[in-house]
């Protein structure tokens, strides 16, 4: 009886540790999904239009190319 009780307590502790670890992971994943398809993010998609405008000169691109080589 004592052994069964000890196994039960240990398994409950391990299960609690597992649930807390996964809750952190799933919580971060849910926040990412929510921010990707939420009302605010869908409304503010036009802020990414400026990402594709190249304000870099040829000299800047050459310097970046040299840095990454």
UniProtKB/Swiss-Prot annotation:
Keywords noted in UniProt: Amidation, Antibiotic, Antimicrobial, Cleavage on pair of basic residues, Cytolysis, Hemolysis, Membrane, Secreted, Signal, Target cell membrane, Target membrane, Transmembrane
Tissue spec. comment: Expressed by the venom gland.
Stretch forming the signal peptide: 1-23
GO cellular component terms attached to this protein's record: extracellular region; membrane; other organism cell membrane
Chief subcellular location: secreted
Positions bearing Isoleucine amide: 37
Keyword Membrane: yes
Location in the cell: Secreted; Target cell membrane
Function: Antimicrobial peptide that is rapidly bactericidal against Gram-positive bacteria.
Entry similarity comment: Belongs to the non-disulfide-bridged peptide (NDBP) superfamily. Short antimicrobial peptide (group 4) family.
Miscellaneous comment text of the record: Is highly capable of inhibiting antibiotic-resistant pathogen growth, including methicillin-resistant S.aureus. In vivo, shows high antimicrobial activity on a S.aureus-infected mouse model.
Protein name: Amphipathic peptide StCT2
Natural source organism: Scorpiops tibetanus (Scorpion)
